């Protein structure tokens, strides 16, 4: 959520920065709600001051033995008036929050202005061998097959997945399933053993409050899988009168960014423990509501996929150093696997909802003769923290400040599997195992039918 103080002080700057993302801000509604909020708040504060003054006056009159009945009568009328004003103020504040909950983050000054992925900027690329004439990885020396054609003889089974679950799911068996697991284990070991992340195991189902905090709700509700619970409620909530309350909605996670980042929700952490570095390997569930007919073949865009996520909770003064560090942590996975990649700085129009600055890592897929995203690393600054009320205290005497939250894929396991299959394919249909993965594969050097 955007800083309300910034909106009140410099609304036009906020509007201009949002326009660079292709987003219009409803200034008329904001100004209307804000002016009404100020008016009610002024009236509330005046009534509170009057209540305090009357209480003092009553005390003075009683101390002198004088009649305080008239003042007490006025004082007794105030609670009802004050309650109405406080309810009006709470309603207006809720409407303001609802407006701001659907507004994306402001782009950092270093983010290039643009409308789409065509305006993203390549920062660097890494190739394990000499480039071809066009600057991309050199051709394999034979007609490359895509990961579906390579994988099906080796244990990648889309027909069984479709029978079990429908389109956009995968079923793996044997060596293919082991290679998929090996990739995830390798990524976790690298992030925890060398990059200082703490491995976490998180729930795959979260409540709506958690999703509001990280920004998936309310804007991206259609992208989530809603969970319908059967049977009775094993943890019924009741109000002050003992009446049952409605159960909070629950959803499958679309990324473990949600659960890892939310560890600090409604928390004030000591400044000396920052940065917090967390990682988790989880399945991710996405409805792909807006994907249309894109990437219907294979594993590129699925309803369920695995990902090793990296999250850092940082001091605002160090968050952009942390962003560059996290990009390097994702890059190291690709380097160790020997996969060609490039780093792209996303433009304002291509960034995610909560991001202030994002780098995408794109891996080379020979069969498509193109680069495809395999990791996205973002600094959300205080955007999520403000929604979650996640703060830190620099020292015992300091006021709490909002932390900065960062997240990134380290990496998407399924897409890494695709990249390994396509880049390490051999003309005879076998696939060489990258050296970094061989310890996880029992020393196997290649997959073959």
UniProtKB/Swiss-Prot annotation:
Binding site for ATP: 286-288, 373-376
Record keywords, A-Z: Aminoacyl-tRNA synthetase, ATP-binding, Cytoplasm, Ligase, Nucleotide-binding, Protein biosynthesis
GO CC terms of this entry: cytoplasm
Pfam families named in the record: Seryl_tRNA_N, tRNA-synt_2b
GO annotation (BP), single: seryl-tRNA aminoacylation
Record bears the keyword Ligase: yes
EC number: 6.1.1.11
InterPro entries: aa-tRNA-synt_IIb, aa-tRNA-synth_II, aa-tRNA-synth_II/BPL/LPL, Ser-tRNA-ligase_type_1, Ser-tRNA-synth_1_N, SerRS_1_N_sf, SerRS_core, tRNA-bd_arm
SUPFAM superfamilies: Class II aaRS and biotin synthetases (SSF55681), tRNA-binding arm (SSF46589)
Pathway the protein acts in: Aminoacyl-tRNA biosynthesis; selenocysteinyl-tRNA(Sec) biosynthesis; L-seryl-tRNA(Sec) from L-serine and tRNA(Sec): step 1/1
Alphabetized PANTHER family for the sequence: SERINE--TRNA LIGASE, SERYL-TRNA SYNTHETASE
Function: Catalyzes the attachment of serine to tRNA(Ser). Is also able to aminoacylate tRNA(Sec) with serine, to form the misacylated tRNA L-seryl-tRNA(Sec), which will be further converted into selenocysteinyl-tRNA(Sec).
Subunit note: Homodimer. The tRNA molecule binds across the dimer.
Domain notes: Consists of two distinct domains, a catalytic core and a N-terminal extension that is involved in tRNA binding.
Protein name: Serine--tRNA ligase
Organism this protein belongs to: Bordetella avium (strain 197N)
Gene behind this protein: serS
